[in-house]
């Protein structure tokens, strides 16, 4: 009996000991372990993400708190998080028991939804095409995600590819729908296509100017651009009411020794329509009449910006508010006076400057244009020069290209034109089309330049066209994976170009500082490639000469820091 009583006493003591151990507080703080290797999580706006750490040394009395900037957002062991705004969110996890408190910080990066937004140039106006012609459309779709495409005509599926050639066999009006879809959303654009017979299509042509100024004895080329649906056109030209040319040729070469105003009229007639355009030609005194001699007060640097019209680009509209051409010129002038860069955007973007004197052609280098090229980073600009032939102090006379190493090559395109279309919304790529049937976009680089539009704010129209000489691009992805791009150089004759010839220095410009290229007025050529034989010039234009982009670096864009009369510096 005593043995039984002793056994019960020991058993009760053991049970009491276990109970006391279960009720005793934990002697060490919690341990927080994340399931993921990195404390950085990623999600998108409006998407929930759940974070469930592994905890040790916790019991029913352990408390949890998740905070952002000291403000509690959750008090359970697991966090389900979502945000309505993109950004980085730093969150502190704390777990507390009787043994202490442990904290661990995580980061959640919330990104914008990558909805496949569509841009189709001129879709808002629709398309009017000639029966049997080809209408191929390649939309710009802004998305890095895998995206599906769908084309429909009058509700019937016709293609699942990005590029679509629409049928134009049957006359009539068609409703076309292009749609995109990915995991983040959808977009669609609908537009009208009218397939017309020859008598229904619109004839279009554009004259870049209707008034010309030229020195007596010179020859200028008069030619419409963007000619559409001419069909069996015959062009008839008259000068001062006298017919001088008639035929299929839409170009007329005007020359005269007779000073004064002359009237040129061109008539386009085909089987369906008659169109006319009247032009005024001012034949001015011989070259040299209005040359301005250098004086003791003359400055080597340009003294006025007459026009600044860049193509869309990542530096356009950045850190300044400009809504008129006059304001744009003032902005560019102030930048150049500080030897700060003026970006010309993508292909065709340009700046026109003048001087307080004429720059003389001495057969050697006469002009210095400052860029910031270095080995592997050339963004070549075509250089044009002009004399003030009518003496009014304005750049409204004849432009002459300064030929460079690529002039005359088959791969160099003269009279190239790119039309830029204002994006349909903010922070989107800027679509473009060209006069060679190509299309593309100036990318929006939100990681670096977050202004709403790369499209110049002082261009009020929804589209504008820039023209000039186009060099074949030389940029390439050296890394093979998009991380290291090279914008290779050209031999000579271009602004912002790492030339071994016309930089006149062996400095490698490793830090991309302002650096000059040099130019000879004796390299000026006429429209047909002949020597212009200019004895001096008054105005200079620099125009972006390449239409290309280099991955994350963006569009190839000539930068100008200064333009100088090199005769005064050498």
PLM segments and residue spans:
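Surface-exposed, flexible coil segments in extracellular/virion-facing regions
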Residues: 65-82, 150-167, 238-254
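Bacterial Sec-dependent N-terminal signal peptides
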Residues: 1-45, 98-119, 183-192, 196-197
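A domain-level signal for the mature, folded cores of soluble proteins
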Residues: 204, 278-379, 403-570
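Acidic, glycine-anchored loop motifs typical of Ca2+
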Residues: 389-398, 420
């Amino acid at each position: 009996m005593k043995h039984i009583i002793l056994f019960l006493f020991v058993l009760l003591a053991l049970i009491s000991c276990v109970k006391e151990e279960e009720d005793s507080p934990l002697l060490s703080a919690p341990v927080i372990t994340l399931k993921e290797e990195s404390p950085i999580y990623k999600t998108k706006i409006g998407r929930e993400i759940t974070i469930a750490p592994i905890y040790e040394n916790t019991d029913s009395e352990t408390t949890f708190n998740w905070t952002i900037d000291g403000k509690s957002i959750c008090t359970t062991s697991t966090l389900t998080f979502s945000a309505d705004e993109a950004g980085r969110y730093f969150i502190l996890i704390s777990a507390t028991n009787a043994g202490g408190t442990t904290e661990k910080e995580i980061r959640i990066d919330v990104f914008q939804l990558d909805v496949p937004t569509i841009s189709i140039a001129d879709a808002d106006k629709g398309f009017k095409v000639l029966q049997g012609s080809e209408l191929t459309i390649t939309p710009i779709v802004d998305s890095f995600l895998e995206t599906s495409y769908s084309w429909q005509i009058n509700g019937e599926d016709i293609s699942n590819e990005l590029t679509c050639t629409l049928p134009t066999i049957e006359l009539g009006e068609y409703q076309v729908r292009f749609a995109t879809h990915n995991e983040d959303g959808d977009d669609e654009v609908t537009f009208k296509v009218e397939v017309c017979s020859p008598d229904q299509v619109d004839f279009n042509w554009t004259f870049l100017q209707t008034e010309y100024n030229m020195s007596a004895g010179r020859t200028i080329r008069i030619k419409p651009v963007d000619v559409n649906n001419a069909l069996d056109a015959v062009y008839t030209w008259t000068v001062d009411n006298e017919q001088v040319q008639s035929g299929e040729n839409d170009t007329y070469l005007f020359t005269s020794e007779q000073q004064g105003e002359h009237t040129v009229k061109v008539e386009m007639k085909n089987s369906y329509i008659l169109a006319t355009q009247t032009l005024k030609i001012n034949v001015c005194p011989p070259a040299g009449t209005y040359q301005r001699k250098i004086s003791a007060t003359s400055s080597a640097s340009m003294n006025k910006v007459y026009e600044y019209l860049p193509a869309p680009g990542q530096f356009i509209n950045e850190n300044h508010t400009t809504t008129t051409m006059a304001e744009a010129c003032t902005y560019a002038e102030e930048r150049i006076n500080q030897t700060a860069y003026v970006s010309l955007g993508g292909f065709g973007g340009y700046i026109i400057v003048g001087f307080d004197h004429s720059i003389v052609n001495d057969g050697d280098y006469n002009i210095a244009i400052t860029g910031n090229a270095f080995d592997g980073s050339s963004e070549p600009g075509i250089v044009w020069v002009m004399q003030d032939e009518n003496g009014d102090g304005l750049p409204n006379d004849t432009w002459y290209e300064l030929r460079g190493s690529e002039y005359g090559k088959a791969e160099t395109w003269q009279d190239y034109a790119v039309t830029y279309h204002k994006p349909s919304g903010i922070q989107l790529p800027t679509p473009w089309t060209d006069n060679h049937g190509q299309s593309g976009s100036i990318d929006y680089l939100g990681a670096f330049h977050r202004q709403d539009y790369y499209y110049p704010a002082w261009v009020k129209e929804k589209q504008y066209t820039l023209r000039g000489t186009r060099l074949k691009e030389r940029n390439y992805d050296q890394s093979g994976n998009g991380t290291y791009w090279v914008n290779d150089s050209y031999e000579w004759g271009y602004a912002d170009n790492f030339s071994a010839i016309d930089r006149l220095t062996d400095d490698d410009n490793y830090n991309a500082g302002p650096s000059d290229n040099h130019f000879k007025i004796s390299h000026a050529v006429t429209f047909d490639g002949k020597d212009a034989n200019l004895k001096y010039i008054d105005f200079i234009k620099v125009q972006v000469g390449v239409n290309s982009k280099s991955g994350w670096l963006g569009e190839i864009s000539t930068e100008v820091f200064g333009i100088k009369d090199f005769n005064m510096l050498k």
